[in-house]
Amino acid sequence: MSALVSPAVNSPRPMTNAELDRLSINCIRTLSIDAVQQAKSGHPGTPMALAPLVYTLWNRVMRFDPQDPIWPNRDRFVLSNGHASMLLWSVLHLTGTRAVNADYERLGQPAVSLDDIRHFRQLGSKAPGHPEYHLVSGVETTTGPLGQGVATSVGMAIAEAWLANRYNRPDFEIFDHNVYAVCGDGCMMEGVGSEAASLAGHLALDNLCWIYDNNHITIEGNTRIAFTEDIAARFLGYGWNVLRVGDANDIERIEHAIFFTRPRTARLSSFWIVTSAMARRISRTLLRPTASRSARRRSASPSATTDGQRTPNSWFPTRCAPISPPASARAARRPAPVGPNCLPLIARNIPNSRPRST
C-alpha cells in the first residue's frame, strides 16, 4: 500500500497540480481496497482501475454540489457495474457530500462517513455492496443486475430532455444537466443495455454519455471466453458518437475526450471506450497465457501493429475523432453550478494535503 502513496505528502514545498491529482486518485484507491480488505468481501479491482476516470469526472467535468445533492439540475452519475460500489462510496466521502432523508430534508451530516466505510458490506451499513437508491445521498439509482444502470440512465436523459423542452426559455435554461454512466463488460453482455442503447440512439439523446470499461476480465477469466463482438461497431449502428479514449489512467486524455463528445455539442449520445490497464494486468497474470497464445491473439486483433501494440482508433471509422482537442476547447467548458462546486473537495478531505501551487 505504501507504494501507492504520493511522496509529495511529506514534501515541504506546495504540491503541483499533477501531484495533487495523483494523491487524490491514490486516496480513492487505497480507501476502496482497505474497505474491501476489512469486509473480507467485495470487488477491489474496478475501484482501483477506474479511480482516475471517476476523479476526472467528479473533479473536472460534472456539475454537482455536495452541500445540496438533490439540486434538480445536477449532473447524474450512474455506476452501472454496481459491484464496484466502493468507488462511489469513496468519492461521496471525499467530496463531503451531505445526507438527505427520504423526504429530501437536509440532515447536515455526511452521506457516507468513514465509519460507514469501515462497515462496508455489513448488515445495516450505509455502504452496501451495491448502491441502493434513497439509502444514501448521491446515489441516483439502484444498480445490481448488470445492464440495469445504463438502461436507467437512458430514462434519466429522456426525463431531462422533456423537462428542458417543457420549461426552458431562450437565454433562460432551467434544465440542462447531463447523465454519465460507467459500465463494464457485463453490462454490454446484457440485453437490457442493448435495448436502451438502441432507443437512446433513435432519440439522439445528446445529454447522455456511457463510459465503457473495456478491461477484458470477468470472474471466470478473459472475456474472450464468451464475448468477442465489436462493441464500437454495434454502437455506431445504434447512431451513437463512439470514441476510444484509451488508458483510463490518463486523466488529461479523459478530459480531452470530454470536449470532443461533450453532451449537447456532439448532437448524439456519446460512448467512450476506456481501457483499465491495471485490471488488464491482473487478467494477464491470472490467465498466464503462453507466448504462442499471446502472439496469436495479437495477430488476430484488428487493431494490432507489427510490434503487437494497439494503435488508438485504428479499428474505428473516420467519424470517430482522435484525441487532440482544439485550443478553444477548455474555454467552452460549461459554467459551474450555483453554490459551491465539488472541485477542491476531494483534496480538502485528504489528510496532510497542501494547496496547489500557482
Residue locations for each model-derived region?
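N-terminal capping segment at the start of a domain
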Residues: C27-S41, D213-N215
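Cofactor-binding active-site loop characterized by glycine-rich and histidine/acidic residues
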Residues: L50-L203
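Hard-cation-handling environments
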Residues: P326-T358
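Basic/polar N-terminal segments that are highly enriched at the extreme N-terminus
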Residues: M1-D21
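Glycine-rich ThDP/TPP pyrophosphate-binding loop and its adjacent helix/strand module
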Residues: P66-Q67, L135, T141-A327
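An alpha-helix initiation/capping motif
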Residues: N26, P47-P52, G82, I251-E252
